[in-house]
A protein has these predicted regions:
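Ribonuclease/tRNase effector modules and their secretory precursors
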Residues: 1-111
Length: 111
């Protein structure tokens, strides 16, 4: 089950470097779009079921300001200055994923 992001989620920012910037932008998703999806109230987040043991990873699905449905994989990182979100990969969603997202958002709004 995917859960909506709550506005109470606090983090100090994003962690970007050459390693994740290129991988995230490889599918044409801009950094600003990724950051918006990870902070938007209608983004749904779930633990990554395919992640091997180790660093926790999460899947986020949501919409950019322009309305593009976007899929983001990220990990939270604890730093001295506070928690940061490190995007790992991002791409625009396929039609089937969009339908699933819309169903989950409707279900969350009914609660």
């Amino acid at each position: 089950m995917l859960e909506p992001v709550t506005r109470k989620t606090a983090f100090a920012g994003f962690e970007w470097d050459a390693g994740n910037r290129g991988k995230c932008q490889k599918h044409g998703v801009a950094i600003q779009e990724i950051e918006h999806v990870l902070t938007h109230a209608e983004t749904l987040i779930t633990p990554d079921p395919k992640n091997p043991a180790g660093e926790p990873r999460f899947l986020a699905i949501g919409r950019t300001r322009q309305g593009r449905y976007t899929f983001v994989v990220f990990t939270p990182r604890q730093r001295a200055a506070g928690a940061r979100l490190r995007p790992i990969s991002a791409r625009y969603m396929h039609k089937r994923e969009i339908r699933k997202y819309e169903q989950e958002i409707a279900r969350a709004q009914e609660r």
